[in-house]
A protein has these predicted regions:
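Extreme N-terminal starter segment of soluble prokaryotic enzymes
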Residues: 1-3
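Hydrophobic faces of well-ordered beta-strands that scaffold small-molecule active sites
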Residues: 19, 73, 104-106, 129
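Classical nucleotidyltransferase
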Residues: 121, 126-175
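Short secondary-structure boundary segments
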Residues: 77, 108-110, 130-132
């Protein structure tokens, strides 16, 4: 797996202060010819871009997430769910074990129905699902944590427990 960046102090992707891992690569099935119009991270579309995820990278992320002011670890892309999920599951398990009380968020261009049965979802707390659609772009407070109005913020734990899609509470226009 290749990564583009680790943002160790972000307030843009989730409530509070987050550590964000940007992975490289996405498959063309979610976007027009693999090139989403208006893509926020065009360089992240190529699997060959960036640097290798290594044990040192994992250590760097864990040390960043351990900081007392960090609330959340966020997976962004590219497309996190088009990566080696075993590597990501291992990373998330380590975060859950070593960094208690940290939420895990995942941004994906897939719909909930496409990803709910993936093993990695057992370790994710919140998923922002759905492809970015340029014509529905909305970065206002009314569309918090999403890039376009079609995207939804899913409470993954409750959704898996109740075996139905449960939207994260407190997010306007989220159903």
């Amino acid at each position: 797996m290749k990564i583009l960046d680790i943002n160790k102090c972000s307030v843009a992707e989730a409530p509070g202060i987050s550590v964000v891992l940007f992975v490289a690569g996405c498959l063309p099935n979610k976007c027009e010819e693999g090139n989403c119009p208006g893509c926020h991270n065009k360089e992240a579309q190529k699997f060959s871009y960036g640097k290798e995820f290594t044990p040192e990278t994992k250590y760097e992320i864990l040390e960043a997430v351990k900081q007392p002011y960090i609330h959340t670890f966020v997976l962004c892309g590219g497309e996190p769910l088009d990566q080696d999920l075993n590597e990501l599951i291992d990373l998330i398990k380590s975060i859950k074990e070593q960094c208690l009380n940290r939420d895990i968020w995942c941004y994906t261009g897939y719909e909930w129905e496409q990803v709910k049965d993936l093993e990695i979802m057992q370790y994710i707390d919140v998923a922002v699902v759905g492809p970015f659609i340029l014509e529905q772009r909305d970065i206002s407070d009314a569309n918090r944590w999403r890039g376009s109005r079609n995207q939804r913020v899913i409470d993954v734990k409750k959704s898996l427990e109740q075996n139905k899609k449960v939207f994260l509470e407190g997010i306007p226009n989220n159903n």
